[in-house]
Design a protein with these regions (language model features):
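Acidic, glycine-enriched catalytic cores built around paired aspartates
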Residues: 1-14, 18, 45, 225-238, ...
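Generic serine detector
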Residues: 15, 21, 42, 52-54, ...
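Aromatic-enriched hydrophobic runs in primary sequence
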Residues: 28-33, 55-61, 65, 170, ...
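Long alpha-helical, hydrophobic tracts
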Residues: 90-91, 111-245
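Structural signal for hydrophobic packing residues in well-ordered secondary-structure cores
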Residues: 39-46, 67-70, 104-111, 144, ...
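Generic structural signal for well-ordered, non-membrane alpha-helical segments
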Residues: 28-35, 59, 93-96, 100, ...
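Catalytic alpha/beta active-site cores
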Residues: 1-160, 350-365
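Residue-identity detector for glutamine
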Residues: 5-8, 17, 61, 95, ...
Length: 365
């Protein structure tokens, strides 16, 4: 259940709601009865699980409301987003990180799974693949520390859309290896894949083809859940029939793939890029840890994470002019991979990029 902006931010604050923006970005539910009616309407057919995205204000009150009204199957929340940095909520970045952590802990205490809506938000803003991979590692680490037992990782392919299939797959495999390094008897990970929200072509035949080829690529990482993005995404909000059609298309592709498909993950080019990304990601993670050398676990410290964004260790080109991040990083698609580059478009190693970031931060301070 995708909520509109006022449902997510101002559900408990009707006076702050703007009737002119009703339905902006999702379903305009306004009362608990609205949610109960939606849940009752779903009690037919195969009696599906139902879940909604978390609120962007009054987080714990909103979470409790979702559990009571729609038996929320799992929490879906972010770590760095859905706050003042992206305009989706009122909280400053560091406070928002703390609130997201509290929300994870609340669900962990109740043995409710948590889905991470995080890495692809960096990808959609043209961040380099290394930053996306680093955030995958950080979110998994934070979720485990907050007591989450079942973590649903979200891998949005084609984000940004100028990734090649080869490099997209390599990035996903790197994220999987990094995130799943925390798996043990107390912490399970369920892989969820989806097609890129910004990747669909406008033409209907091309969009249908894109959905099918995207799901086939996703199946190579053996997802437990496929989040189907309707093929109409680039043109209009999907109708019920179009949602059903999109799900049937994705389901058929998944069935075909499960009968036996070539192993695209074995491509040596894919494997080489995956290993490169993992190595470069650890360079970035070490740089973030070094911001707070006196802490035992800097990667789960809200102040450290907010500072990593503030100085540009975690950055994206589309964060330019943002009060919480420099947006100074430059990226380019090179051979289908998203890499950080210098002013002349030359690819930078992660060590080179970090040295530039730290030098700039020292001057600014």
């Amino acid at each position: 259940l995708g909520a509109d902006q006022d449902a997510q931010e101002n559900f408990f604050r009707p006076s702050n709601q703007d009737p002119k923006s009703k339905g902006a970005g999702g379903v305009p539910f306004r009362t608990e009865d609205d949610l109960r009616r939606l849940y009752e309407a779903s009690r037919r057919g195969n009696y599906p699980l139902m879940r909604s995205y978390s609120g962007t204000r009054d987080h714990l009150q909103y979470a409790d409301m979702l559990v009571r009204t729609i038996n929320n199957a799992w929490c879906a929340t972010s770590l760095f987003w859905f706050n003042a940095m992206d305009g989706r909520g009122p909280s400053p970045l560091e406070q928002s990180i703390r609130e997201h952590m509290e929300l994870m802990a609340w669900h962990g205490e109740r043995d409710i799974p948590v889905e991470g809506n995080e890495p692809y938000h960096w990808g959609m803003r043209d961040a380099p693949d290394v930053v996306v991979c680093a955030v995958s590692y950080i979110y998994s680490k934070v979720a485990k520390k907050m007591g989450v037992r079942d973590y649903i990782t979200t891998y949005m392919f084609e984000s940004p859309p100028h990734l090649s299939n080869r490099m997209d797959l390599a990035k996903c495999l790197a994220q999987i290896e990094l995130a799943e390094s925390f798996v043990d008897e107390s912490f399970s990970i369920w892989r969820q894949t989806r097609t890129g929200l910004l990747s669909y072509p406008l033409g209907v035949p091309q969009a249908r083809a894109h959905l099918a080829q995207s799901v086939m690529l996703q199946m190579s990482v053996k997802p437990h859940i496929i989040h189907v993005v309707g093929y109409t995404e680039a043109d209009h909000a999907a109708t019920a029939d179009e949602v059903i059609e999109s799900a049937q298309m994705a389901g058929y592709v998944a069935e075909v793939a499960l009968r036996g498909s070539p192993d695209m993950t074995a491509d040596p080019v894919v494997q080489e890029r995956k290993e490169e990304l993992i190595a470069e990601t650890h360079v970035l993670l070490d740089a973030i840890r070094a911001l707070s050398p006196d802490l035992d676990d800097p990667l789960t410290d809200p102040a450290t994470l907010a500072r990593a964004v503030k100085i540009g260790l975690l950055d994206a080109p589309q964060l330019v002019n943002n009060p919480y991040a420099p947006g100074a990083i430059r990226t380019r698609s090179i051979d289908g991979a998203i890499r950080a580059v210098d002013e002349q478009g030359r690819p930078l190693t992660e060590r080179e990029r970090i040295d530039r970031v730290l030098a700039r931060a020292e001057v600014m301070e």
